Design a protein with these regions (language model features):
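Intrinsically disordered, low-complexity Ser/Thr/Gly-rich stretches
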Residues: 206-375
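Short secondary-structure boundary/capping segments
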Residues: 12-18, 103-107, 113, 133-149, ...
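Accessory cap/linker subdomain of secreted extracellular hydrolases
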Residues: 1-82, 172-177
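Short beta-strand/loop motif that positions the catalytic acidic residue
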Residues: 83, 89-91, 95
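Surface-exposed intrinsically disordered loops and tails
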Residues: 22-59, 130-151, 291, 367-375
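C-terminal catalytic histidine-bearing segment of alpha/beta-hydrolase fold enzymes
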Residues: 116-204
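Loop/turn elements at helix/coil->beta-strand transitions in domains of secreted/extracellular proteins
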Residues: 84-87, 113-118
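Conserved alpha/beta-hydrolase "acid-adjacent" motif
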Residues: 96-104
Length: 375
């Protein structure tokens, strides 16, 4: 049920390219039009050439160097301007295929335009919410939402969807509640009017003080394995993180380029689990989908205004928050403009977390999994 807001937006984040991005859309889907018979020529169209070329070009040059191939395949603006229907977004918070930045903050943009929208955001990945066996296989991942099993199983989701269709397509039944059902990585479901929610408290941690460097130097090398690791002091109380955390890092580079990957972990001693990550091609250091202003390498500095992929995580008292900076990670390609990136610690480099008070929230327990072998 995962949906796209655009083709480029699916496979690029702040200019950084997933490994599949340069060739998948046209190299894979486009190949369905070619099967080696004499009728192939009837299926040929310019996009078979333009598409892969644009994909490779977006990685090499950081954007659409010529033409409007990607712009034609961006859908969200037309939905916001023209759509008169309803939207029910069902999204896995750890979907490796359709990342949650397709749905967050899209859900709020829809609501702000008056479009009747609801969200069901659980800790599954690219699976249906009621597939017990597939979700069970995630339960020993060590993070990435696997710890939310079995509470992530939603046997009621298709009934919910049926009632949505009955109301909006047939006028039967009653109007659904237009809220967001969001699950934390520890399994608890709660109701939010919007997501990210508005009633949050920002916690700011400075690199070098609140987050102490515990290993590595200040340089991030373009080898995907060398960079600094920062860690907080043990938390005095439970921390509940939601939405789109930010990492603003002041850096200098050896060339006009480079890339930063940030891994955020919840650590109990040396036992750490993944709770979130962010990535940025530094040519996009101001954030967003447009190339940013240039800078002078070596002597000049820029602030990489990174935004994490949407997350909802609980970090318990006594645990620490660990931040690792590398040149790439997950399934992202190294930057075409690889460079040594030097982290400037201090007030210009901060991790910004949006937290909430669970006692202020409406929580509930969905239908419980009773599968005797798995739950």
């Amino acid at each position: 049920i995962s949906g796209l807001i655009g083709v480029k937006e699916l496979m690029w984040k702040n200019g950084s390219s997933e490994a599949r991005a340069p060739i998948m859309h046209n190299g894979v889907y486009g190949s369905y039009g070619i099967d080696g018979d004499e009728e192939d020529y009837q299926n040929l169209c310019p996009d078979y050439i333009i598409g892969p070329g644009t994909g490779v070009g977006a990685w090499a040059w950081g954007g659409e160097a010529a033409g409007d191939y990607w712009a034609e395949r961006y859908f969200l603006d037309r939905v916001l301007d023209n759509y008169g229907g309803s939207v029910y977004l069902i999204q896995g918070m750890h979907d490796w295929n359709v990342d949650p930045h397709m749905a967050v903050p899209t859900i709020n943009m829809l609501k702000d335009r008056g479009i009747e929208a609801k969200g069901l955001f659980g800790q599954w990945d690219h699976d249906y919410p009621d597939r017990t066996i597939q979700l069970y296989e995630r339960s020993d991942l060590g993070g990435r939402g696997g710890e939310a099993f079995p509470e992530m199983i939603r046997f009621d989701w298709m009934q919910d969807l049926l009632e949505w269709f009955d109301w909006y397509l047939k006028g039967d039944g009653w109007q659904p509640e237009l809220h967001v059902e969001i699950q934390s990585n520890q399994g608890e479901w709660r109701i939010e009017d919007r997501y990210p929610a508005a009633d949050t408290t920002e916690v700011v941690m400075t690199l070098g003080t609140d987050l102490e460097r515990i290993s590595g130097g200040s340089n991030v090398l373009p080898d995907a394995s060398t960079g600094p690791v920062y860690e907080s002091a043990p938390l005095e109380s439970d921390m509940f993180i939601q939405g789109l955390p930010r990492l603003h890092v002041e850096v200098s580079t050896s060339t006009v380029g480079g890339q930063l990957y940030a891994l955020l972990e919840d650590c109990d001693g040396n036992n750490c689990i993944h709770i979130g990550h962010a990535i940025m091609d530094l040519r996009y250091h101001e954030g967003g989908d447009d190339l940013s202003s240039t800078w002078t390498p070596v002597i000049g500095t820029i602030t990489a205004m990174m935004e994490f992929i949407a997350m909802d995580a609980e970090v318990y008292a006594g645990h620490t928050i660990r931040l690792t900076l590398l040149s790439t990670g997950e399934d992202y390609l190294p930057a075409s403009t690889s460079s040594i990136v030097t982290i400037q610690e201090g007030e210009g480099s901060t991790l910004q977390l949006d937290t909430y008070n669970p006692s202020d929230k409406l929580t509930w327990v969905p239908p419980v999994c009773t599968h005797e072998d798995l739950c």
